[in-house]
Amino acid sequence: MRVMTSRDAQLYELKKKIDELKKIRGRGTELISLYIPAGYDLSKVMQQLREEYSTAQNIKSKTTRKNVLGALERAMQHLKLYKQTPENGLALFVGNVSEMEGVTDIRLWAIIPPEPLNVRLYRCDQTFVTEPLEEMLRVKEAYGLITVEKNEATIGILRGKRIEVLDELTSNVPGKTRAGGQSARRYERIREQETHEFMKRIGEHANRIFLPLLESGELKGIIVGGPGPTKEEFVEGDYLHHELKKKIIGIVDISYHGEYGLRELVAKAADILRDHEVIRERNLVNEFLKHIVKDTGLATYGEREVRKALELGAVDTLLISEGYDKVRVHVKCNNCGWEELKTMSEEEYEAYKKRIQTCPKCGSQNLTFEKWEVAEELIKIAEEAGSNVEIISLDTEEGQQFYRAFGGLGAILRFRIQGV
């Protein structure tokens, strides 16, 4: 098990912020996206924003003009907080997010990315520009997967925790015959030639898929699998490009083909890929399940239980599903002091805001709502306690099971605790 690196935590939080930003739509071209590369002079950015402010005063629509000017003012105020551009650069997203016409709610998101920004961009549009940040989420390392039988083959890729089928091929290689004499020998020669041609076709398709990944430095290895000797014949023959043959790191016996075959190939290659994310994730979820099934007291799930275990310093590894979307909501009446703290989904939050229009104690409409991600809060508590943190994807069967059966939040414990 590993401690989740700060970069892993940043990537998880970055994905959540990108998802939030992509949902926002402006009423006009009034949402500002600003990307400042690492090492760029902030004074030049401020000068550009002042020029944009001057230009924005000529916008015909009064509402759009007001919102763009407000967003630019907010951006310039925020940039004054920095003496210089952060080490990895800075991305600002500013604009009116109110869904009510005539109501202004200028919000700002400041994101220091987990790796250096190399793009400089200013855009005022109906949506925020998130593509440069999304590229940072893309897993760069990839493993090629090939399953080979006499009459069918599947080519795929393992990238991060996702197994993707890229190509499926079938052949007309005839089955073995029981006939004897010259007919049998002629039949066998035809069969061998058909097999050879099919292998060539597999190699050509694999070369077309994997060579670009090799050239970009993304391809870390190739694993070949199949139910019989055909896979060895394919590997030993001159079917793959010689540079790709050097990347073969394992040959594995499997029973299935197609997508199931690729999944079996990855599972059977666990020793080869033992440090890879998908194998580590499978092992972690299985360890969690083992403790739950055997009732060892060394695993727990659910927000209340996990939060208590974290606060007691009992968590060895915090497990959070990518699909976990719970938020903590704090609402307070500024008139009488009534307040409420609840955990709910994003969807439930929207309904909750519409339902709580007035204070249930004094009837005042002077309410303040505060909302934050439960996952981000628990990650911070875990890091302070020295606990491991693992984000569990939805791309594996184990990840899907963890999300559906346990709500996507659980923990493996260092020691047993009462009441959890």
From Swiss-Prot:
Places the protein is found: Cytoplasm
Q: Which GO terms describe its cellular component?
A: cytoplasm
Q: What are the UniProt keywords, alphabetically?
A: Cytoplasm, Protein biosynthesis
Main subcellular location: cytoplasm
One family name in Pfam for this protein: eRF1_2
Q: Is Cytoplasm given among the entry's keywords?
A: yes
GO MF annotation, one: translation release factor activity, codon specific
- Superkingdom in the source lineage: Archaea
Oligomeric and partner information: Heterodimer of two subunits, one of which binds GTP.
Functionally, this protein is described as follows: Directs the termination of nascent peptide synthesis (translation) in response to the termination codons UAA, UAG and UGA.
The record's comment on protein family reads: Belongs to the eukaryotic release factor 1 family.
Protein name per its UniProtKB record: Peptide chain release factor subunit 1
From which source organism is this entry? Pyrococcus furiosus (strain ATCC 43587 / DSM 3638 / JCM 8422 / Vc1)
Question: What taxonomic lineage is listed for the species of origin?
Answer: Archaea, Methanobacteriati, Methanobacteriota, Thermococci, Thermococcales
Gene encoding it? prf1
